[in-house]
Curated annotation (Swiss-Prot):
General function of this protein: Metalloproteinase inhibitor that acts on both matrix metalloproteinases Mmp1 and Mmp2 in vitro. Complexes with metalloproteinases and irreversibly inactivates them by binding to their catalytic zinc cofactor. Required for wing maturation which is the final step in morphogenesis of the adult fly. Involved in the negative regulation of developmental tissue invasion for imaginal disk eversion during metamorphosis by inhibiting Mmp-mediated basement membrane (BM) degradation. Required for oogenesis and for the long-term maintainance of germarial structure and shape in the adult ovaries.
Organism: Drosophila melanogaster
Protein name in UniProt: Tissue inhibitor of metalloproteinase
Signal peptide: 1-27
CDD domains in the record: NTR_TIMP_like
Length: 210
């Protein structure tokens, strides 16, 4: 077999490999989101403790038996699901599955019917005070404010809207120590409400040492 045939077969093999492994990677791509956005878009937001883990209840899926400690938000359908105390996720990391550690407490903000890498899940002890306050009620007070992902200097210099806060996924100060909240502003036409990043003490400290 000559060199061209070898190269042809190699090319076909590489195409097949990328086609096979490329699909799960595409399926797992998700836009970065601020914790406040996760709260707003979630079907349920709970604080839970992971009790057990099983890979045999449902083929291709990992099922976690959990104890729901607090429910911060849930649709009626999500409440019915949570009564069973079970959350499932794809068994394979390449199919967007996640791993929760047994015995640990997490805040989880998820969409029905499954938990995956695009969901919000964070160990409670690793959360900042601002994040804890946001999920326990702070974010619910800012339903009229939207966090908008912003990439590059051109975006941040662009037009600002009264109901949004621009956010860089690399901005740890806004992510960990602030929330997009309504704020009263005095104008020539009277008092209006605009959304802005809440200037907590921890946020100001972070901004002074970015």
């Amino acid at each position: 077999m000559d060199l061209r045939k070898h190269l042809g077969l190699l090319t076909l093999l590489l195409v097949a490999v990328f086609a096979f492994y490329g699909r799960p990677a595409d399926a797992c791509s998700c836009m970065p989101s601020h914790p406040q956005t996760h709260f707003a878009q979630a079907d349920y937001v709970v604080q839970l403790r992971v009790l057990r883990k099983s890979d045999t209840i449902e083929p291709g899926r990992t099922t976690y038996k959990v104890h729901i400690k607090r429910t911060y938000k849930a649709t009626s359908e999500a409440r019915r699901m949570l009564r069973d105390g079970r959350l499932s996720t794809p068994q394979d990391d390449a199919m967007c599955g996640i791993n929760l550690d047994l015995g640990k407490v997490y805040i989880v903000a998820g969409r029905m019917p499954t938990l995956n890498i695009c969901s919000y899940y964070k160990e409670y002890t690793r959360m900042t005070i601002t994040e804890r306050h946001g999920f326990s009620g702070g974010y619910a007070k800012a339903t009229n404010c939207t966090v908008t992902p912003c990439f590059g200097e051109r975006c941040f210099k662009g037009r600002n809207y009264a109901d949004t806060c621009k956010w860089s996924p690399f901005g740890k100060c806004e992510t960990n120590y602030s929330a997009c909240m309504p704020h009263k502003v005095q104008t020539v036409n009277g008092v209006i409400s605009r959304c802005r990043w809440r200037r907590t003490q921890l946020y100001r400290k972070c901004m002074s040492n970015p």
